[in-house]
């Protein structure tokens, strides 16, 4: 049962945003910029962001060369370019909004390892020419001549992107939440949305009670989890598996690395290596929102 004061204070809003990850925080902040006096609340079912915002590898990236070439074929060149450009512009907004230090930005660049079928000079030049109108600079460089200092084996080609960086995903989300609260945006954790009917949002809180909130504008920013609220939305999750090593003395590389069309990726975290990917080994199982290991993929990553 809610008290008189709780009913007066917590039940009605101008805007309700469901999901307090990167997307939810970004939407809420943009709403604040447009509507300075609006009552805005962000609902998060966990104690901190439940989804990929704090469970990713911490790459500030927008696509490796082979991933882009694959996307050109899959989506069409212009649509793929729009996606790539939006990723890059979004990263710039994130950095400007939160500050480099507050997201742990480390501009070490991004790399792609080619174990077979290296890109020809003409293919790389064509890709850079296609990207030039969006980035205004050369995006990818062939640095295969420097490959030995990285300590990689069986790599035929090494491509470098100076525009990519590493970030600290936990630190980033902590500061995004701080930014919302400084701008009078309320975040309610332990608030799992069970149902939406018109302008009413039914949530279950961590102590087992059911509360109904009201707003004329409700935005769902739960991404992979959206089908738990709206079953008719054609969105499938793409879960990822990530492992991390113990410390490795004299680790020969630093930066963000991809291979196999971006399906595999790794980076240094201090002296440790965070390694993830392999979703292409088991697409069906990885269309899941369960937080559990996929033994097939994890064993492949360990090898």
Placement of each model-derived feature along the sequence:
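Glycine-rich Rossmann-fold phosphate-binding loop(s) that bind the pyrophosphate
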Residues: 19-25, 45
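Glycine-rich active-site loop/strand segments that organize a redox cofactor
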Residues: 51, 55-86
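Helical element adjacent to the flavin cofactor pocket in flavoenzyme catalytic cores
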Residues: 154-217, 221
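Extreme N-terminal leader/targeting segments of oxidoreductases
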Residues: 1-15, 33-34, 38
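Flavin (FAD/FMN) cofactor-binding and adjacent substrate-gating region
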Residues: 66-72, 96-178, 182-183
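Glycine-rich FAD pyrophosphate-binding loop
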Residues: 32-55
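Active-site lid/adjacent beta-loop-alpha segment flanking the redox-cofactor pocket in flavoenzymes
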Residues: 251-303
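Central helical "cap/lid" subdomain
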Residues: 205-253
């Amino acid at each position: 049962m809610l008290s008189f004061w709780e009913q007066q204070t917590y039940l009605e809003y101008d805007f309700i945003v469901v999901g307090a990850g990167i997307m939810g925080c970004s939407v809420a902040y943009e709403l604040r910029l447009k509507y300075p006096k609006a009552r805005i609340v962000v609902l998060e079912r966990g104690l901190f962001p439940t989804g990929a915002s704090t469970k990713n590898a911490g790459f500030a990236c927008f696509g490796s060369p082979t991933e882009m070439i694959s996307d050109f074929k899959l989506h069409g060149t212009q649509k793929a370019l729009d996606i790539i450009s939006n990723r890059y512009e979004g990263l710039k907004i994130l950095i400007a909004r939160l500050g480099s230090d507050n997201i742990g930005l480390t501009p070490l660049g991004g790399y792609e390892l080619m174990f077979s079928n290296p890109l020809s000079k003409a293919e790389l030049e064509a890709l850079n020419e296609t990207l030039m109108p969006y980035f205004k600079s050369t995006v990818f460089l062939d640095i295969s001549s420097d490959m030995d200092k990285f300590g990689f084996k069986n790599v035929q080609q090494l491509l470098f992107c100076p525009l990519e960086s590493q970030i600290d995903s936990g630190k980033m989300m902590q500061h995004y939440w701080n930014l919302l609260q400084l701008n009078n945006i309320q975040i309610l954790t332990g608030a799992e949305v069970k149902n939406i009917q018109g302008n009413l949002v039914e949530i279950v809180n961590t102590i087992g009670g059911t509360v109904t909130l009201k707003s004329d504008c409700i935005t769902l920013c739960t991404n992979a989890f959206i089908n738990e609220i709206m079953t008719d939305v054609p969105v499938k999750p793409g879960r990822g598996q990530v492992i991390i090593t113990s410390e490795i003395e004299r680790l020969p590389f630093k930066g963000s690395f991809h291979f196999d069309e971006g399906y595999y990726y790794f980076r240094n975290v201090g002296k440790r290596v965070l390694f993830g990917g392999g979703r292409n080994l088991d697409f069906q199982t990885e269309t899941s929102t369960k937080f559990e290991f996929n033994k097939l993929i994890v064993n492949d990553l360990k090898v």
